[in-house]
Amino acid sequence: PNPALQQGAEGEDPAAQGPEPGTPQAVYTPPDVPKTKGTLTVGFGRFNPPHAGHGQLMDIAAGSARDSEEGSDYMIVPSKSEGKDTDPLDFGTKVEAMKGMFPHHSGHISEDENFRTIIDVLKYAHNQGYANARIVAGGKRVKQFDELSQKYNRALYDFGNLETISSGDRDEDGEGIEAMSATTARQAALDNDYDTFSSTLPTDEEGNDFAGEEDLF
């Protein structure tokens, strides 16, 4: 098995952190950027390792962009965090796996290593001229992302509408997508349990396994 995956359990999401200490707030206002675009929907997470459940988050982000006003788009942003028990895969390996697992979203998966937190992404969206922003997060992260993002609106970025929506709740006792988790995949690698690890990964439209799953394991 991939030695990197033979590590820890779930932890805090570094994506849901505020700006670096010392970032001015009261005296800082966002750059004055013409709002020429609609809504940017952002799916931000560790994706470490990526699994079938993440496809649901990406589909929701894509659907949100389609249903929004003209000039809207979506982006999937993997965090840069790596090297800890909960983040065993390096950034490049993670992005490559995500693009291979979800080819229909490949063009929307960011390779920018400067996006360390959701705040970085929202500042980018503001500077790109988006009038609104929407964050897609797992059920238990929604409140955390919403409170953090709202805290810095009008200070580090400026959106007329800023909201966080859920990609769904994970049911550890359930089956299918709702039961998928990166923790399960990491534990399967730790236990050298290839079958369970494989079951967490998506298949293509013909039901074929992800081509890179043996290398990822």
Label every PLM stretch briefly.
Residues 1-26:
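Extended, compositionally simple fibrous regions characteristic of intermediate-filament-like scaffolds
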Residues 18-217:
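Nucleotidyltransferase catalytic core that binds NTPs
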